[in-house]
């Protein structure tokens, strides 16, 4: 094996951080506040919310991004000098676009496979808006810190915006060095927040993710990471996330979903399910939370329950009045995987076939679904259908790993391992 280079450190670090912070959003819902607020007694969390900010975040966590953006635009207009208001709006715009392009599927981040994925196709105008709002938020934070370097709220929101920029640079620009610098800046800001205000539990969400990620790196990468001052502890990371989740603060939901993802990696499925079910109870219109419950049941080996959960998600999504713009192709593919695990090859083939019928389906997911459907047809001894699926995979992207697998299956029918 070749040794890890510095780019590997950045890629592995960002991969883990994105896994914890990206999937369901990382943002601090707070009331726009004046800089004078920061000089009071050390705060235990972000400032309280106003009615419009609360409304924005209710819509945000329901995945009704359009309404959330409208609310946050009004807040920023009323408080143009507040870095929190800028952070809220850019977060909603960014995650709205990520959701549109199918980048919030947890399956992408359960492993590091997304590192090799092509850039997500962001709309150019949206990208420009995101960059402008991030720069505005950072500038407003810096203005407050210039007046008071120990302004806890300014440090906190600067850390949030730096983290958001790290996600954008990694996913959209694939700029790993720049993403790593911003991720480290976010971590250091929130470490300083806890030093100045030890009861500021919301800062533990970011730090919990970072500590867990660093503790999960290969030892060779840890050695390189230590050169830039990165400590690590998976146990401490998970405990920090539990602390933030149980504190009931502004990042409680974000801490729970990071917990669910990391506990899934630890095979602590019951704990992960408990975290997700709390989120579902609080936000029953959030399609991704419901999908994550089904994913966890599948990964836990609870096949029949997973099948039922995926079917419930699909049925609810097709009603058209519960979830906002659900990417049902994600649930269809998950259903195929769950049915495959139950040796229901005909049912799995049907589920995989339905993936390409969704207008929102990502081309990579369609490719994976076609390959999987072909394998099911081979197991069902329907070779003609299998061959058509393999040919479709190769036609879509002849240089992909799926195409290489499809070529092997064209030479020899797929058989169950």
Protein language model annotation of sequence segments:
Residues 13-26:
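Bacterial N-terminal signal peptides
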Residues 35-52, 59-71, 81, 92-150, ...:
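Short coil/linker segments at helix-helix boundaries
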Residues 54, 88, 95, 157, ...:
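"A position-specific structural signal for the A-helix of alpha-solenoid helical repeats
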Residues 78-82, 147, 196-197, 248-250, ...:
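Short solvent-exposed coil/turn linkers within tandem alpha-helical repeat scaffolds
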Residues 85, 154, 203, 255, ...:
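TPR alpha-solenoid repeat register
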Residues 187, 191, 212, 229-233, ...:
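TPR/TPR-like (Sel1-like) alpha-helical repeat modules
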